[in-house]
Amino acid sequence: MPDPAAIPPQNPFQPEEPLPAAESSPQEVTQVTLSVKLAPGTRLHVTLETLTPDGQRLSSQSLDYASDESQSAVSLEIPASRVPAASQPEPVEAPVERRPGQLAAPPLLASLKTILRNAGWGFILALVIYLATRLIALTDYPMYFFTDEAVQTVLASDFVRDGFRNYAKEFLPTFFYNVYQYNLSVSVYIQIIPYLLFGNSVVVTRGVSVLFSVLPAVSGGLAFKQFFNSRYPWLAVLMLSIMPAWFLHSRTAFETSLAVSFYAMFLYFYLLYRQDHPRALYPAVIFAALAFYTYSPAQLVLVVTAVLLFLSDLRYHLRLPRDVFQKTAGLTALLVIPYLRFYLEHPNENLNHLQQLGSYWLAQIPLIEKLGRYFGEYLAGLNPLYWFFPNSIDIPRHIMGNYGHLLVFSLPFIAWGVFLAVKNFRSSAYRTLLIAVIAAPSGAALVGLGITRTLFMVIPAALLGALGLASTMEWLLRMWQVKRRILAVGTFLLLAGFNFFMLGDALTAGRTWSVNYGLAGMQYGADQVFSEIINYHQHSPETKFILSPSWANGTDILARFFIPSSDPVQLASIDTYLNQETPFDSNTLFILPPDEYQRALDSAKFTELKVEETIPWPNGQAGFYFLRMRYVDNIQEILSNEAAARQVLVQDTVTVGSEDLLVHYSRLDMGPISNLFDNDLNTLIRTESANPLKLQIDFPTPHTLNGLTLRIGSTAATLDLAVQVDGENSARTYHQELKEDVLPRPMTVDFGEALNVTSLFIKLKNTNDSEPGHVHLWEIIWK
């Protein structure tokens, strides 16, 4: 017999859908009438089920019909005698009377169970594939174990050690102090139990994050089936899984992926609330709060999302039952209390956070310029070129080679999904996807575009891509008359295969996507170096280790993660031993990256250098040198000569306007001295090793000056200025200090009156740095 023309074949990854439940009770059903168009000679199999209000199956009846060869339509009447009798469920509490138009409230947990039960084996298999591509070789990709991952477990261990108090002695704190700022919260708390069970482990720390990353995969698949009426919930799971930005970050312990996971759950339960489940607002609010506390850029993303959702569905919200509204408001107030507590205890911390991030909002520029910067960054976060193609904005460790943040092959499907969302804008589910897209870059724009701050985009992108692909599949079914089962299985295998291809590519080619393995790049080596130190110490307990920290951020945090505090490991750069005589003995083993090893060789300050071992970088080159050495016999003489040389000023003549100025200055390793007088704020000088920078400017004829302005960097600075006035025996002195800032800024000295100046002597010091050091200066302007 030919296939039915109007009834699609079964989806191999989805259980058979029940007929919609009648609104009346089972006892009132006397007849069911179906009008179906059939190809001539088609046999029709009908399954009629009765369900409880929460979706539980009570009874089922199957019937078979056949159309004549000449028939193209048939009307089927199923008499009451053939309608399956509905076994009555256990007596339940009488329904609450509701006002006309008020929302109904089906049991939330029962609905969730039904949704999961009907998701199908394809959905379950897709989740297995998702987890497999996250857990396989978890420590090998990303190749680095970053300090921002290690700090989660280190803070958790300190929290347990200190009686569930943070470093400020706050019991069960809202936020934990991370180096310079309070910015970690939920990501620390979720590591406590794993730490107590398994201790410090890269697999465990990352594995916890991976398990939470399943949340958007589950919620995305269920949302795709439940709110977008798709028969392919696995499409959303596999589409999310192959988004490169998510593939990379969901395999790390960065708090950004955790915040995105909670954000996805917030969206899911909000959409469930929009399907006449008012009590779904409770978990929606809880997951929104978890995302809010997990990652600071999520805070503005959530605010923007919540405001737009409120306005978008205002008429629906006004029908919210009073008791649900009151409980939701109470729950929200309860979840705000930890933030209020934190704000009262640390009122300046939000400002400090923006300072640490270098936000332009704190710069001394007009408000209109700040707004322009914000919307410029925001629009850049919506630019498809940023998302689908390689870029130079993000640092290499946050990029998967040439993949782009969103898979370029998904671009046409996502674009078609956006079209469908706009077309179906009257549907709350589609509007929510567009709102999530609009909100995603809002948090990043406060500081600057970066994938960790805009990672929220992967959630709507994956669902939009799944919508576009599902629509394309339906088009293929109509155009090619291909069997649905074959197309579904083929698409599933293609997406699943690409998941494992991406995993294999990351584990092999990914090791050389970037060959910058140092501080400015991948920061490779934490697990490898510290594991070797532990192994070395077990065989040679008398050895003392001096490890350079210059190859990674927060090397002290990494050391605490991998090595017990009792082990003899000291963090120090080779420069500590090059610039001053620092004692060490023959039991000292230096561990240096290539650049520091080369400086030690070239310095002529050490002898008897012996490399005992090397640890290679992923490209095969030596990445770390384990060596022993000692100072040369005349080291004190060499260091004394270098200190004296730093005080010797270089002399040069600089033309400023029509005058030639004689300038004496400290040795430079960046920029000519003329950069200070070219009226260009983009050019600068930097001292080779002197701190403070010393400058003497001699005018050929006296200049009438009222003050002096230096364009300095963001570091804390101290200025000592001596002004020689024509006819005076001694120079007038001025002293000024500026604290650290977020951007380069002017440092101005007002003389208080007009002076006839013959020379200026400037000493500019980085307040918090010692010598040798680097001092930066952009411009000198007198008035």
For each feature predicted by the language model, list its residue ranges.
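Aromatic, loop-rich ligand-recognition surfaces of beta-strand-rich domains
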Residues: D678-Y734, L743-K783
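Short acidic/glycine- and proline-prone juxtamembrane loop motifs at membrane-interface regions
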Residues: F145, A245-T256
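Disordered, acidic Ser/Thr/Pro-rich linker "stalks" and the adjacent N-terminal cap
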Residues: Y631-T701, R711-T715, E779-I781
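Membrane-interface transmembrane helices that cradle and orient dolichyl/undecaprenyl
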Residues: F227-S230, Y263-A284, A291
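Membrane-proximal, lumen/periplasm-facing interface regions of secretory-pathway glyco-
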Residues: F175, Y403, R484-I574, A717-D720
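Transmembrane-helix motifs of polytopic, lipid-linked glycan transferases
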Residues: G207-N229, M265, P412-F419, L467
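Transmembrane-lumen/periplasm boundary regions of multi-pass, lipid-linked membrane glycan transferases
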Residues: Q152-R165, L197, Y273, Q299-A415, ...
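Hydrophobic/aromatic-rich transmembrane helices and adjacent perimembrane loops
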Residues: S250, L300, H405-F413, Y430-L476, ...
